[in-house]
Amino acid sequence: MEFKGAYTALVTPFKDNQIDEEKFREHIEWQINQGIYGLVPCGTTGESATMSHEEHKQAIKICIDQNNGRVPILAGTGSNNTSEAIALTRFAKEAGVDGALSITPYYNKPTQAGLKAHFKAIAREAPLPTVVYNVPGRTGVNLLPETLAEIKKEIPEVVGVKEASGNISQVSQAVEYCGRDFSVLAGEDFIVLPLMSQGGKGVISVVSNIAPSKMAGLCSAYLSKDVDKALDLHFDLAPLCRAMFFETNPIPVKTALSIMGRMDLELRLPLVNMQPENESKLKQVLKQKQLI
C-alpha cells in the first residue's frame, strides 16, 4: 500500500482524564469532510506517551468506526519496548487499520543494528504495512538513510518513513536510497513542499488538525503538478506551522482547537497549558488566518 498526501496526526480530546469520544468522533468527521487523505490516531500529537494500552485500543477502535472505510488509517503502534510494539501492532492489524506508524525506540538509544532488529521482530510477529517514524529530537536516535534502505530491502512490510530529523539532505537521501516507490513523508509541516519536490509523497501533519483543507490542498496541488498553487499554500500555512511549535507539540494545537471551539482544552501531565504570552501570540495568528 502506498501512503501519500496529507495525513492528520490526530489530537486525542480528553474530558475528566478520559478520552472524549464525542469530540474525537466530531474531529475525525470534520477532517474527512475537509478532504484529508488519511488519519493517524495514537501518535505523538495524540499524547500516546500518556495513554494506557487500553486507551490506545479505544482510540483506534473509535477512529476505525467513525471513518467507516472512507480514508486510510495509519495507527501509531510504536514503543521503546519491542514486545509492546508487537502487541499494539497485532491489535491494530486485527482491528482493521491500513497500516502502522512505528517510532524508533526512544530512551534505549539502540544502534543501527538494533533498529533493524526491532522492526524485523515487529514485522515477523505482526506483519502489517508500516511507516517507520524517525524523530531524533524526541527519541535520541537517528535512523540513518543507509539503514532505512537496508530495512526496506530486508523487511517488505516497511513501506515508508515519517522523516522528522529536520535535515532536508537526509530526506533527499532517504528517497535516493529507497527509491521513488517508497513513501517518504514529512514529519514536520514546514518541510512538506521541499520534501515533495525531492520525491517525497506527503506529510503526517500537526497543522492539519486546524487547517485540514489547506494542507490537503498543498499536497494535492503538488501531486497534480500545480507548483504555483502548492507554493501559495506553503506560504499561507507557514505562520500556522510556526505557531504550532510556540511550545511543545501538542500543547499549541490543542489550545488552538479549544480557541476555535472544536473541543475542550485538557492536556495530560507532564504537559501543561500554554504560557499566557505564547497563547496570546497563537490567538493573533489564528485571527490573521481567519480561524477565529
Predicted regions located by residue number:
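Active-site beta->alpha loop and helix N-cap motifs at the rims of alpha/beta catalytic domains
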Residues: 1-8, 12-15, 19-140, 150
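Alpha-helix N-cap/helix-start motif
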Residues: 49, 85, 111-115, 141-144, ...
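Short helix-capping segments at alpha-helix termini
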Residues: 65-71, 94-96, 126-128, 153-157, ...
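Catalytic alpha/beta core domains of metabolic enzymes, predominantly
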Residues: 124, 138-242
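Glycine-rich phosphate-binding "P-loop"
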Residues: 134-135, 157, 268-269
